[in-house]
């Protein structure tokens, strides 16, 4: 586990050169006393502008999507935890280091914090396909966040741009989803579908009850 801007970030233990073997996406043995709903956000194509078929390998290539800061701030102001759940296979492929990924997230968090829109938890699967238990559409990252933050999944939402994001929510028992349309042809139904992240704030105000 690493700390980025005061936020615990889950990552592959082997890449941190720690001796004891653990299952990726480590679980805590305790839960906070209160239960709070969350908004789970995919990263590329939702929080930041999509890199297309490639990867965001450097912090200077990471650009927040128009409208996303306002949407994230609204979620926090209305009583939701903010959790980032992202697949970053570029680390597993050796295209970037874990340190580079951490730097991207640290800079992202610093920018978001200036607007009261920072994430409460960041969960990144950096493994190659077929080599772990946390790669989407597995619900593992959501379950880890639930245990770490005491989340009420039955009152939570997920925002993503790919079928694997929506299916991840279904597999975790997160009942409400918002799809951001992309070049991926949708095959899994979402609760709401938007053309871009710029429409997200309006959708939240019209459809999402305050959690306080």
Model-identified regions with their sequence ranges:
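Active-site neighborhood of HAD-like aspartate-dependent phosphohydrolases
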Residues: 24-83
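Asp-based, Mg2+/Mn2+-dependent phosphohydrolase catalytic module
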Residues: 20-34, 43, 99, 103-120, ...
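Intrinsically disordered, low-complexity segments enriched in serine/threonine/proline/glycine
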Residues: 10-11, 15, 165
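Active-site loop/turn elements of alpha/beta-hydrolase fold enzymes
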Residues: 52, 87-88, 182
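Substrate-recognition element of Asp-dependent hydrolases with the DxDx(T/V) motif
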Residues: 68, 72-108, 118-131, 169
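N-terminal polybasic/positive-inside topogenic patches
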Residues: 7, 17-21
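Extreme N-terminal basic, low-complexity initiation segments
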Residues: 1-11
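Conserved protein kinase catalytic core
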Residues: 48-50, 93, 167, 202
